[in-house]
């Protein structure tokens, strides 16, 4: 069973300024919004600020219908736009169950139909994949969206078993909807990086859109641990794909709100996963977001490798202190900068809060 709900909305506060999606093409994303719907202190306005950067999201780890409705309502109140949601039944092998959801901006995307939960006769998946067909209102481009949350399990082998089963599911999608075979997109949290050997069967017919970076937030600010989230498309796809990447949402929230979001706060209040996205050709992310991504991708200032001039970009670090940092190498942790004359507790906290200084492995 699937559930589709749509409602009207009115504007209260614009949190982002995006071009009219109906006049451009789409921004598609996949996001594991950790335990969406549980009473765990989720900051729905913050989640909505990130979700509003896109026109369509495939969401994993939806714990109940109330959670996805609340996110939709927050998006509508914040953007003044109408958003719709389609979600699966609760899926799982035991008392722990999750839903999948598709969430989209009505001005940009139309639900075409064909919502299906995979009939997993071999019981290979703990949570069977969910799919539906959509189209861009601006260009009439159709796409068959499918989403899955691969089990983490007790061993990597548990994940590999499900990853290998994706090939049969991928072929099944083409069999049941052959008219959309070239327009399939598999959104998900796969709990396995795309270069792992377990993907061999899928790699024969499909390709990941994100191959560099990482999507899971580490406990260290501005550091990401694993590339688990991704989007897969057919090798012979007919989709108008543009840029794809990872949205480092703690950086974006820090910029948009004016309040620093460290990884501890981001993991507790939003998610321990960053969204991955793909843009259809002719589209871009919001300019401020693009700038922040560029800053993030530019990398941090490594205390053990940066030049004196690069070190002076850090707060409270002039040429003399930069020379002292260079002379004090190797550094084991950013907190050790307190050994530099003139860097007291307050200045050290500001350096750490900016998230620009690091110790690269």
Curated annotation (Swiss-Prot):
For this UniProt entry, what is the primary localization, expressed as one broad class? secreted
Q: Which Pfam families match?
A: Exo_endo_phos, HHH_3
Keywords of the record, alphabetical order, are: Calcium, DNA-binding, Hydrolase, Magnesium, Nuclease, Plasmid, Secreted, Signal
Q: Name one GO biological process term.
A: DNA repair
Domain text from the record?
Harbors two domains: an N-terminal domain, that exhibits DNase activity, and a C-terminal domain, comprising a duplicate DNA binding helix-hairpin-helix motif. The C-terminal domain is responsible for the enzyme's resistance to high ionic strength, it acts as a facilitator for DNA binding at high salt concentrations.
PANTHER family, from UniProt?
DEOXYRIBONUCLEASE, EXTRACELLULAR NUCLEASE
What's this protein's name? Deoxyribonuclease
User: Which species is listed as the source?
Assistant: Thioalkalivibrio sp. (strain K90mix)
């Amino acid at each position: 069973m699937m559930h589709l709900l749509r409602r009207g909305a009115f504007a209260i506060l614009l949190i982002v300024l995006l071009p009219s999606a109906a006049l451009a093409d789409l921004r598609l994303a996949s996001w594991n919004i950790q335990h969406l719907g549980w009473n765990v202190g989720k900051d729905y306005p913050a989640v909505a600020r990130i979700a509003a950067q896109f026109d369509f999201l495939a969401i994993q780890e939806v714990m109940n219908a109330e959670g996805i409705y609340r996110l939709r309502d927050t998006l509508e109140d914040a953007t003044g736009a109408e958003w719709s949601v389609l979600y699966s039944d609760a899926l799982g092998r035991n008392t722990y169950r999750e839903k999948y959801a598709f969430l989209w901006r009505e001005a940009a995307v139309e639900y075409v139909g064909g919502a299906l939960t995979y009939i997993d006769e071999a019981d290979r998946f703990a949570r069977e994949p969910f799919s539906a067909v959509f189209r861009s209102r601006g260009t009439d481009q159709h796409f068959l969206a499918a989403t899955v949350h691969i089990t983490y399990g007790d061993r990597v082998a548990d994940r590999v078993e499900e990853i290998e089963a994706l090939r049969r599911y991928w072929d099944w999608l083409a069999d049941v909807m052959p008219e959309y075979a070239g327009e399939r997109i598999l959104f998900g949290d796969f709990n396995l990086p795309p270069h792992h050997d377990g993907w061999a069967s899928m790699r024969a017919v499909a390709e990941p859109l994100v191959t560099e970076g990482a999507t899971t937030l580490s406990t260290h600010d501005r550091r990401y641990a694993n590339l688990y989230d991704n989007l897969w498309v057919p090798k012979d796809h007919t989709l108008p794909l543009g840029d794809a990447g990872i949205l480092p949402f703690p950086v974006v929230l820090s910029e948009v709100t004016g309040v620093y979001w460290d990884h501890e706060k981001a993991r507790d209040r939003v998610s321990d996963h960053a969204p991955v996205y793909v843009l259809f050709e002719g589209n871009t992310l919001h300019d401020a977001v693009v700038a922040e991504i560029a800053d993030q991708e530019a990398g941090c200032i490594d205390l053990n490798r940066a030049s004196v001039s690069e070190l002076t970009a850090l707060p409270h670090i002039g040429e003399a202190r930069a020379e002292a940092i260079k002379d004090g190498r190797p550094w084991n942790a950013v907190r050790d900068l307190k050994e530099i004359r003139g860097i007291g507790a307050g200045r050290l906290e500001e350096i750490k809060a900016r998230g620009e200084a690091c110790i690269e492995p």
